[in-house]
From Swiss-Prot:
InterPro entries: Helicase_ATP-bd, P-loop_NTPase, SEC_C_motif, SecA, SecA_DEAD, SecA_motor_DEAD, SecA_preprotein_X-link_dom, SecA_SF2_C. Part of the Sec protein translocase complex. Interacts with the SecYEG preprotein conducting channel. Has a central role in coupling the hydrolysis of ATP to the transfer of proteins into and across the cell membrane, serving both as a receptor for the preprotein-SecB complex and as an ATP-driven molecular motor driving the stepwise translocation of polypeptide chains across the membrane. It is found in: Cell inner membrane; Cytoplasm. It is a peripheral membrane protein. PROSITE patterns: SECA_MOTOR_DEAD. This is Protein translocase subunit SecA. It comes from Pseudomonas fluorescens (strain ATCC BAA-477 / NRRL B-23932 / Pf-5). One of its GO terms (molecular function) is metal ion binding. Monomer and homodimer. Part of the essential Sec protein translocation apparatus which comprises SecA, SecYEG and auxiliary proteins SecDF-YajC and YidC. Belongs to the SecA family. Its cofactor is Zn(2+). GO terms for cellular component: cell envelope Sec protein transport complex; cytosol; plasma membrane. Zn(2+) binds at C897, C899, C908, H909. SUPFAM superfamilies: Helical scaffold and wing domains of SecA, P-loop containing nucleoside triphosphate hydrolases, Pre-protein crosslinking domain of SecA.
Length: 913
């Protein structure tokens, strides 16, 4: 009730933050005259001065005004660009670990230099994260002269980069790269066999460009490094032949069956489900082709893998469409990012789905993969000490940024007011009518000399639009995932008078459409241009620029609404940059995916009530509101999926941190003899306790079993029964002590034979191998657990709590297995006197061979589809997402452990740590 009044009196929180920062802007401006008076050498020397002051204890916050003034002056001298006051506010926002929302054309790349320069002074490294390799290289090369003038080094990490180059890039003060590459390098580092093979330093400060795309859109899909498993290509081929014989079961809204079939498709949750008739039919067909034994069920324990293949085939045929979710390029299935429209070469779907699509397209089927390491962007980016980001559209997702990452969104005021006109949506009954109206709009704009950008949601739609325009004889350029190599060239000239560009969602994120075209690109295309040529190109551009402004600026036409309002706003934002004229219009039909699945009934009834005829369109705020409501519904569902992924991965993440900490400790240690001694004692205690129950009588002891277990686990044959017969005073504790001494003596004898140095090297290698193999198997087990855990909802159990409980049990077993298997291998194996350097070189060769076989998957989120049990109202504990790692508190020894076991920390993971 009083909120509007208080806001009017005191302003919004965002306005108050801007006012606070404006005071610092004034201090920065006060330094400007002093900086202008400095020579280049004196200005450059400021960096060394700042580093010295930091070494003496001065904070970055205190340095900020002077450092920003230095960066601004360097920008003027090197780039010919002076930071506006609002850009200084953007730089402060980044330094404070917040998200800066800035409109298109407001100079986000230049803003980043302020926060990056200041934080690079600490010497701990700064990562600048972009959405693709092109932008990483472009921004690094663009800003490199500025940073190098200021005495800072710049590196770029790219896929397939030689290790030496990549290591040098990470050692630089400022490192550019994509979110995928940073994430995969983190996983690779935790698979390395020596500290020298690692790339990344401690994760200090990251600036994420297009932060909404990376932290929101891509958060649903985990990063997975996998290796090849057994070949099942024949199985995929056979099942692919059977799938077309299955028919879809279709029901009307009232529940009346119009087509009885074998399976149902839910487009909202992107799931397929076999019904009873489908199960029976597929079992009969599998029996006929010899894949299922006579009388056996698909649900038998040993046939569950076959059932997974059937569902993968169904999904490949019914949910994945060529030129929408993927394209076929050079005999490979290449995935298309649904949010950006870009192809993702090298990325593969998990759970056999990629192989099923290859079978569907009659391509060579590549071997299935097994997970070697995985993480999510949510948990990776929360490892940074400080995280910040920039985008043109973050405010709609401010709640999620705060809930998941603890990041506040600051809306930075524009340098010039927005002059773009956003028209109401036009809704048609059919897609053909919609496309006809779009072409009429295009023709009208072209007669006025206006440039037009037509945005589409899929490659298929962009190609359909292109075909329609070709029939009309209208010249145009197409920008989609098939031709993204030409992206910069096409976008650069998309603002010329009368230019027509068809683009998917990838359209120039990070590349501005300049009205009149981009004169710098024209100059760059010339070999050794003369000053006269450059002057002429600038003059020609000025005329074209004025012509486009007078005609109304860039017209953005959208052929459909995306699931996310954010992506619609990004498309609109292509027009009206830096106060330029421009306009936008969305053309929709009831046949569009979003309308058909989420919003069609209400709008269709409204259109019927108006008595609309073929070819007519409706333009009404009520329709726009209905569509936005549908989008909010989809956004809410996607948020729930991302949140559920995080809640499950938080459990995995705690385990991942323990294993990676253990691994890094092993790698860094020169001598792990104490660790081996601890392992030996723990394994011996567990072995003795299994055969001699605590506080039991000697008659209850399984001495023969203990002798056998000692022989099996430690490679030593000990006459335990004889000891007991000969010594009446040998009870449980003294027996443990005697056994331990005998085992230590046997191991010392092995050390004398092999040599201490050789054995120390061998110990580290064995424990690393055992840890990696068991961790890989553990990840697979956790995947299977996650896939089936939602079924616990039917038993009125909380799936998330059940997952926590069972995963803790599995993890405890994993830690015991690491100790047990390491000791068993070390006890049985014969160690040769080998040159440790040769052994390490051999190990590195094996690691490199493994790396060549690795696949990098940005897979669909496993096991996170909304299960029926949850949708039907079974209560699920949806706790608020945890705070970022950088804010976590250290647990006291007597506090409850974070893993959910119910034990005190000192008796649980505190022991491990």
């Amino acid at each position: 009730m009083f909120a509007p009044l208080l806001k009017k009196l005191f302003g919004s929180k965002n306005e108050r933050e801007v006012k606070r920062m404006l005071k610092t802007v004034q201090i920065v401006n006060a330094f400007e005259e002093q900086m202008v008076a400095l020579s280049d050498d004196q200005l450059r020397a400021k960096t060394a001065e700042f580093k010295a002051r930091i070494a003496k204890g001065e904070t970055l916050d205190k340095l900020l005004p002077e450092a920003f003034a230095v960066a601004r002056e360097a920008g003027k001298r090197i780039m010919g660009m002076r930071h506006f006051d609002v850009q200084l506010i953007g730089g402060m926002t980044l330094h404070e670990g917040k998200i800066a929302e800035m409109r298109t054309g407001e100079g986000k790349t230049l803003v980043a230099t302020l926060g990056v320069y200041l934080n690079a002074l600490s010497g701990k490294g700064v990562h600048v994260v972009t959405v693709n390799d092109y932008l990483a290289r472009r921004d690094a090369n663009w800003m490199r002269p500025l940073y190098e003038f200021l005495g800072l080094s710049v590196g770029v990490v790219t896929p397939f980069q030689p290790p030496e180059e990549k290591r040098a890039a990470y050692a630089a003060d400022i490192t550019y790269g994509t979110n995928n590459e940073f994430g995969f390098d983190y996983l690779r580092d935790n698979m390395a066999f020596s500290m020298e093979d690692k790339f990344q330093r401690e994760l200090n400060f990251a600036v994420i460009d297009e932060v909404d795309s990376i932290l929101i859109d891509e958060a649903r899909t985990p990063l997975i490094i996998s290796g090849q498993a057994e070949d099942s290509s024949r199985l995929y081929t056979e099942i692919n032949k059977l799938i077309p014989r299955l028919e879809q079961h279709i029901e009307e809204v009232e529940g009346q069956v119009t087509k009885a079939g074998h399976f149902t498709v839910d487009e909202k949750t992107r799931q397929v489900e076999l019904n009873e008739a489908g199960h029976q039919f597929i079992e009969e067909m599998l029996t006929q082709v010899g894949l299922l034994a006579e009388g056996e069920s698909l649900y038998s324990a040993h046939n569950l893998g076959l059932l997974t293949h059937v569902y993968a085939g169904l999904r490949a045929h019914k949910l994945f469409n060529r030129n929408v979710e993927y394209i076929v390029q050079d005999g490979q299935v290449v995935l298309v990012d649904e949010h950006t429209g870009r192809t993702m070469p090298g990325r593969r779907l998990s759970e056999g789905l990629h192989q099923a699509i290859e079978a569907k397209e009659n391509l060579n089927i590549q071997a299935e993969s097994q997970t070697l390491a995985s993480t999510t962007f949510q948990n990776y980016f929360r490892l940074y000490t400080k995280l910040s980001g920039m985008t043109g559209t973050a405010d709609t997702e401010a709640f999620e940024f705060h809930q998941i990452y603890g990041l506040q969104v600051m809306v930075i005021p524009p340098n010039k007011p927005l002059a773009r006109k956003d028209y109401n949506d036009l809704v048609f009954l059919t897609a053909d009518e919609k496309y006809a109206a779009i072409i009429n709009d295009i023709k009208e704009c072209m007669t006025q000399g206006r440039p037009v950008l037509v945005g589409t949601a899929t490659i298929e739609t962009s190609e359909h639009m292109s075909n329609l325009l070709n029939k009309e004889g209208i010249e145009h350029k197409v920008l989609n995932a098939k031709f993204h190599e030409k992206e910069a060239e096409i976008i650069a000239q998309a603002g010329r008078p009368g230019a027509l560009t068809i683009a998917t969602n990838m359209a120039g994120r990070g590349t501005d459409i300049l009205l009149g075209g981009n004169w710098e690109v024209e100059v760059a295309s010339l070999e050794n241009p003369t000053p006269e040529q450059i002057a002429q190109i600038k003059a020609d551009w000025q005329k074209r620029h004025q012509q486009v402004l007078e005609s109304g600026g860039l017209q953005v036409i959208a052929s459909e609404r995306h699931e996310s309002r954010r992506i619609d706003n990004q498309l609109r934002g292509r027009a009206g940059r830096q106060g330029d004229a421009g306009s936008s219009r969305f053309y929709l039909s009831l046949e569009d995916s979003l309308m058909r699945i989420f919003a069609s009934d209400r709008v269709k009834n409204f259109m019927k009530a108006l008595g609309m005829q073929s070819g007519e369109a409706i333009e009404h705020r009520m329709v726009t509101n209905a569509i936005e409501k549908a989008q909010r519904k989809v956004e809410g569902r996607n948020f729930d999926i991302r949140k559920q992924l995080l809640e499950f991965d938080d459990v995995n993440n705690e385990q991942r941190k323990v294993i990676y900490h253990m691994r890094n400790t092993l790698l860094a240690a020169d001598n792990i003899g104490e660790t081996i001694a601890d392992f030996r004692q723990d394994v011996l205690n567990a072995t003795v306790s299994a055969h001699i129950p605590p506080q039991s009588l000697p008659e209850q002891w399984d001495v023969a079993g203990l002798e056998e277990a000692i022989q099996s686990g430690f490679g030593v044959s000990l006459p335990i029964q004889q000891w007991l017969d000969e010594d009446d005073h040998l009870y449980e504790e003294t027996l443990r002590e005697k056994l331990l001494n005998e085992l230590i003596a046997a191991y010392n004898e092995k050390e004398d034979q092999a040599g201490a140095e050789a054995l120390r090297t061998f110990e580290k290698q064995i424990v690393l191998r055992v840890l990696d193999d068991l961790w890989k198997d553990h990840l697979s087990t956790m995947d299977h657990l996650r896939h089936g855990i939602h079924l616990r909802g039917y038993a009125q159990k909380n799936p998330k709590q059940e997952y926590k409980r069972e995963s803790f049990t599995l993890f405890s077993e994993l830690l015991d297995s690491i100790k047990r298997d390491s000791i068993r291998v070390l006890s049985h194996v014969q160690v040769r006197r080998e040159d440790p350097a040769e052994e390490e070189a051999r190990l590195r060769q094996e690691a490199e061979a493994l790396a060549q076989r690795m696949q990098f998957e940005h897979a669909e989120a496993p096991g996170l589809d909304q299960p029926e049990a949850l949708e039907e109202g079974v209560e699920v504990d949806v706790a608020l997402a945890t705070a970022p790692v950088r804010n976590e508190q250290k647990l006291g020894r007597n506090e409850l452990c974070y893993c959910g076991s119910g034990k005190k920390y000192k008796h649980c993971h505190g022991q491990i740590n």
